[in-house]
Amino acid sequence: IRRDSIDKERYLIDIQDLNWIRVGNSHEWRIGIRREFWGVTETAHRVDILNQTDQVESFDGEDKLGQPMVNFSLSKDWGTLDVYALLGFRERTFAGELGRLRSPAVINTDLAQYESAADYHRTDFAIRWSQSYQDLDLAISHFSGTSREPEFRLMEHKGETTVVPFYGLIDQTGLEVLYILGGLAVKFEGISRSGQSSRFSAATAGFEYTQVGILGSRFDLGWLMEVNHDDRLPSSPIALGTRFTFNDLYDSQILSGVLWNEQSGETSVFVEASRRIRECCKLSLEAIYFNGGHAGYDGYRMLEYFDQDDFLRFEFIYYIGN
């Protein structure tokens, strides 16, 4: 349950995880509402498509809405095969007129449009194969259905022009690769998608190198770098960051970094920190700073709308039953 004293578009009642699970010798049935994450990279989640993004909750796209689904999972020597029937569609959340972060134009979610005649009642389908080969993890997936990422259209409503989301039908094939070599983790995820105007590809690749027990302590320090590419954009950012792990009883860690677009000069600096409190609670902090880049640059800017905005979230979680 979420309420907001300023922006009513943040109001939310959402069941995120509620499942019936039946386990067999080499298979599982999972029926209910779930959140399931696909992907291996940190700064962009290309293949993660089953759940809708709760965009008003966080800028990075990692917060998701629960998705009603039926999932059959089969585990064999040749890998794990998951088949999904996704029952109904969840619309993406957008900030209202008084909310942040948002685009200059308020998105009218009450007038959302769909390519499918079934609107938000459509059942979508997905399949994913994954396998581990010693130090190598692979996954191949395919999704067919209503895109979780809307396009935006102008329409006349009550004598005024308004911006509405349009959810088209897509087919998306994804690839995930994770290779571990000692303290080095090499990561890649990419997609090819058809159905939104023309086919396009997008990918994120990079590495994370972890120094274990720095300076003879129990602390670990990870260094990460990722590059991004999207056929739809003239340029994409490079990400540099660090992950500091305390290796204590409370799973304390700090992830920080910067996304930098060489062409436009745009940057965003982010910090994510979390720590458990005993067995009952968890504290987390998320902060993002935006910089608009070169003053004389007149090309496409990914962060143009956020130049005057920054983001800070502090969260306290209490786990019922502890």
Predicted segments with their positions:
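Outer-membrane beta-barrel "beta-signal"
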Residues: 207, 306-322
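Repeated loop/turn-to-beta-strand initiation elements of outer-membrane beta-barrel proteins
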Residues: 26-29, 78-81, 135-138, 183-187, ...
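Residue-level signature of outer-membrane beta-barrel architecture
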Residues: 21-24, 33, 73-76, 130-133, ...
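Outer membrane beta-barrel
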Residues: 1-101, 134, 288, 292
